[in-house]
């Protein structure tokens, strides 16, 4: 279509978009302090109402809601995708003195199988037990060590790519 130098507006019918399949891979619940307020059952009900076949849970730095999320998804016929939005220390998870590593960069980590889930649990445990400095943090060494079965994605404006 030639607009001859004018601003053109294209209108699409939403009915054709309604048949598209969509899954949220970056979702926060009430367990993401200061960033999520939705209850896990509420998130799953909304996904079901929207016709989504799957849904991820990626709370900030923790997996506190994973059991409820998994069980409720299974009851409602939604495929649960287990994950976490991790904080990655720029230098080392053991660095607890420099402000550069105070909060870490955000990274979405999703488990694609049982091995991935076990590695995700290991990463979250390490973040709390060894890497906690203002927030639970991991580092790239830990990611390299426990990467099997995981899908890694940039997160948000707090991620390494956006920084």
State what each model feature region is:
Residues 4, 9-163:
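Phosphodiester-processing cores and adjacent nucleic acid-binding clamps
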């Amino acid at each position: 279509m030639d607009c001859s130098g004018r601003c053109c507006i294209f209108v699409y019918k939403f009915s054709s978009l309604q048949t598209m399949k969509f899954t949220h891979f970056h979702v926060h619940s009430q367990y993401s302090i200061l960033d999520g307020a939705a209850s896990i059952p509420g998130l799953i009900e909304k996904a079901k109402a929207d016709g989504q076949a799957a849904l991820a849970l990626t709370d900030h730095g923790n997996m506190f809601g994973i059991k409820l999320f998994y069980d409720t998804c299974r009851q409602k016929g939604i495929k649960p995708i287990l994950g976490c939005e991790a904080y990655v220390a720029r230098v080392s998870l053991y660095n607890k003195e420099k402000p550069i590593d105070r909060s870490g960069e955000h990274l979405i980590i999703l488990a694609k199988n049982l091995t991935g889930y076990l590695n995700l649990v290991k990463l979250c445990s390490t973040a709390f037990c060894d890497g906690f400095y203002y927030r639970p943090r991991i580092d790239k060494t830990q990611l390299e060590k426990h990467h099997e079965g995981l899908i890694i994605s940039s997160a948000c404006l707090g991620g390494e790519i956006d920084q």
